[in-house]
Design a protein with these regions (language model features):
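Contiguous beta-strand/loop segments that form the cofactor/metal-binding neighborhood of enzyme cores
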Residues: 1-175
């Protein structure tokens, strides 16, 4: 779930925090390592109730092309957020132009929001959004590792336990 979890956040935000109804996925382990058993690449295809689809693809393999980007293809254009900037092409074309006197660092901005909430005594609670986003990532992992379509309800009601059974401090731990 750690792989590209924030890309899953972006998909949820693009869908106005509505969670997908199901997903399918493919993935695997290309590069054997000294231990470990998690996928080093996965692609998840999320489906929303309105028929919209969102795709998340990632890999953790040295020497490969790397990009973190969000592209939303709509009927009137394409929105794109990459390390090179943000823009919309099509009917409502737009390009982000940073103001020289403003901060845009995401870490600075999240800290400013936190400090403002403390000073104003207003709770800042993203718990529900974070829980749903994490569950969305878990649902994608479940689909990838099982090769099955997984619904939101199946993921929520799953009894899957990935923790090794550790009965003592001397118990062997599978890597």
């Amino acid at each position: 779930v750690e792989q590209a979890v924030h890309t899953v956040d972006w998909l949820a935000w693009a869908m106005k925090d509505q969670m997908p109804v199901s997903c399918t996925a493919v993935g695997g382990r290309q590069i054997p390592a000294n231990g470990g058993n998690i996928f080093d690449h996965i692609e998840v295809n999320y489906l929303w109730e309105n028929g919209a689809r969102g795709f998340m693809a990632q890999r953790q393999i040295n020497g490969c092309f790397g990009e973190t980007a969000l592209r939303i293809l709509g009927t009137k254009g394409i929105a794109e957020i990459t390390g090179r900037g943000s823009s919309i092409t099509g009917e409502n074309a737009w390009k982000f132009k940073p103001a020289k006197d403003k901060k845009y660092d995401m870490y600075d901005l999240e800290h400013e929001d936190l400090f403002l909430s403390i000073r104003d005594n207003k709770a800042l609670n993203d718990g529900d959004r974070m829980m749903k986003s994490t569950m969305m990532a878990i649902m994608g992992r479940m689909a990838g590792y099982t090769g099955q379509q997984v619904t939101w309800e199946q993921a929520l009601n799953s009894k899957e336990n990935l923790m090794p059974e550790i009965t003592s401090w001397d118990s062997p731990v599978t890597v």
